[in-house]
Amino acid sequence: MSKKLTFQEIILTLQQYWNDQGCMLMQAYDNEKGAGTMSPYTFLRAIGPEPWNAAYVEPSRRPADGRYGENPNRLYQHHQFQVVMKPSPSNIQELYLESLEKLGINPLEHDVRFVEDNWENPSTGSAGLGWEVWLDGMEITQFTYFQQVGGLATGPVTAEVTYGLERLASYIQEVDSVYDIEWAPGVKYGEIFLQPEYEHSKYSFEVSDQDMLLENFEKFEKEAGRALELGLVHPAYDYVLKCSHTFNLLDARGAVSVTERAGYIARIRNLARVVAKTFVAERKKLGYPLLDEATRKKLLAEEEE
């Protein structure tokens, strides 16, 4: 690698590359979530028959992973670059390897391995065949072919490529700590994110009001259900995301037992499944507008039979 790309140059390079492959460039979704997969741009769009190709950066919050800014590689919040393509291109792995070349990483000169790691997200009823991508011994990407999302079988199959931007940048810039990553010329990652990392860790582990969080979970769950009764998929899903983040805060605080934990996850999953079913039904009512006309008419005719 000749030039060491800054963090923002890595993002710009990936955006341009996947734009050239036909992906829409979406923006980060404005609700807390634990992974880019939970964005409606993946979760909702991976189900149903309509095509969908999108790429976006997603800040992902995982309260239990916070380490007060003292761990060089483990974070309360990290950034993912998410690519979803439906139907999955037959050459998606080749496209991914080409994206590494655009970042200055020649796969022929490095040990790039696809290590089987089937993916599952119990709280959203989602699963798929997957691989971790290891670059010279470090995981930098999760590769998944969705089989089920929101409890629904997927078809056509969606391919998801999730780059861990901090790990990728650490490798490209040859630094041992994420806080030493150059975000932009002259500005280090730690100068932007070290203080919030410490504060969010302190809040998650020591300060958060458990009673308030428990009460909020109940309210968010109830409101999600109420929105679903009215057929309002997107507001309902926003409250599912709020339930998920609230549960993660409770979990980090040690406020839920092992048995309670399973119960909370099941409650979130049940809501997510209803959201998924309702979304597909609403898209059908709209006539699957993202399908080409011939496919749309054929599919709607088949579903009427």
Curated annotation (Swiss-Prot):
Subcellular location: Cytoplasm
Keyword Acyltransferase set for record: no
Catalytic activity annotation: tRNA(Gly) + glycine + ATP = glycyl-tRNA(Gly) + AMP + diphosphate
Domain of life: Bacteria
Keyword annotations: Aminoacyl-tRNA synthetase, ATP-binding, Cytoplasm, Ligase, Nucleotide-binding, Protein biosynthesis
Family as reported in the entry's similarity comment: Belongs to the class-II aminoacyl-tRNA synthetase family.
The protein, known as: Glycine--tRNA ligase alpha subunit
Annotated source species: Streptococcus thermophilus (strain ATCC BAA-250 / LMG 18311)
